Amino acid sequence: MDEAPLGQIKENKMKRLIILLAVFMMSCTQQKVTDAEVIELLDNYFTALDVDNLESNMIDKYITDDYFIYEAEKKMPTKDFKVFISEAFKSFNTASSEWAFSDIRISTDINSAHISYINDGKFLSHDSILTEMKWLETGYMVKTNDGLKMKFMFSDNIATKITPSSK
């Protein structure tokens, strides 16, 4: 019966150990946040801010407990931001709201993401007055046990156009 020399047995065991260790380490490697996850969160965040959804507290699913935004030259925690948006919709008598994003730039790692973009918002009032606003915005997102969430937003209004009703 042929027996492998002791050195070859040790070498084979070492190779198996290295292979097992490599497989284990690869399975433990965390994946970076993807651009698709970032865009999905941004879309969901603004869907939650839609005039039809704002009162539902849907936004809470997409933000961290310590979320805040810098908007209208003020730092606002979630509660204050909800009041700000609600009052803005009421003052404009908003019937519909929509946003379109352009010039999107995303940077990610395994635990977080940063996005900057131009946000073009259109708000139609019940009196058919169209308000178009353009913002330069940036957001910081973090991985949580519940998935990717918005932790911070910065929003700077760079243009506003109001088109009166043609009635």
Residue ranges and their predicted role:
Residues 85, 101-106, 119-121, 136-142:
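Hydrophobic/aromatic beta-strand elements that line small-molecule binding cavities or substrate pockets
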